[in-house]
């Protein structure tokens, strides 16, 4: 999948789930399940409930996403 096909949204982490998954409420009031990107895991960036984040989603499945950035 190329980079152009990815949709990016901002959201807020509402709940921490098992297996490093998170429930995220997007700006447009949709709720999705997201996991952290590998680069965030490698650099040990912590994501907690209430954090504002950037999520990448594929247009094929709009219920799952990947957390790519945590705002400061």
Swiss-Prot record:
Keywords of this entry: Cytoplasm, Initiation factor, Protein biosynthesis, RNA-binding, rRNA-binding
Entries under Pfam families matching the protein: eIF-1a
One Gene Ontology MF term: rRNA binding
Gene3D superfamilies named in the record: Nucleic acid-binding proteins
Limits of the S1-like domain: 1-72
Entry-linked InterPro entries: NA-bd_OB-fold, RNA-binding_domain_S1_IF1, TIF_IF1
UniProt subcellular location: Cytoplasm
A GO-annotated cellular component: cytosol
Membership in a protein family: Belongs to the IF-1 family.
HAMAP family the UniProt entry points to: IF_1 (MF_00075)
Subunit structure: Component of the 30S ribosomal translation pre-initiation complex which assembles on the 30S ribosome in the order IF-2 and IF-3, IF-1 and N-formylmethionyl-tRNA(fMet); mRNA recruitment can occur at any time during PIC assembly.
Known role: One of the essential components for the initiation of protein synthesis. Stabilizes the binding of IF-2 and IF-3 on the 30S subunit to which N-formylmethionyl-tRNA(fMet) subsequently binds. Helps modulate mRNA selection, yielding the 30S pre-initiation complex (PIC). Upon addition of the 50S ribosomal subunit IF-1, IF-2 and IF-3 are released leaving the mature 70S translation initiation complex.
PANTHER family referenced in this protein's UniProt entry, alphabetically: TRANSLATION INITIATION FACTOR IF-1, CHLOROPLASTIC
Protein's UniProt name: Translation initiation factor IF-1
């Amino acid at each position: 999948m190329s980079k152009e096909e990815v949709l990016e949204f901002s959201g807020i982490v509402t709940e921490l789930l098992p297996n490093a998954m998170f429930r995220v409420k997007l700006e447009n009031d949709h709720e999705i399940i997201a996991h952290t990107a590998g680069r965030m895991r490698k650099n040990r960036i912590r994501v907690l409930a209430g954090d504002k984040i950037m999520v990448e989603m594929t247009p094929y499945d709009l219920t799952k996403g990947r957390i790519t950035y945590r705002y400061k």
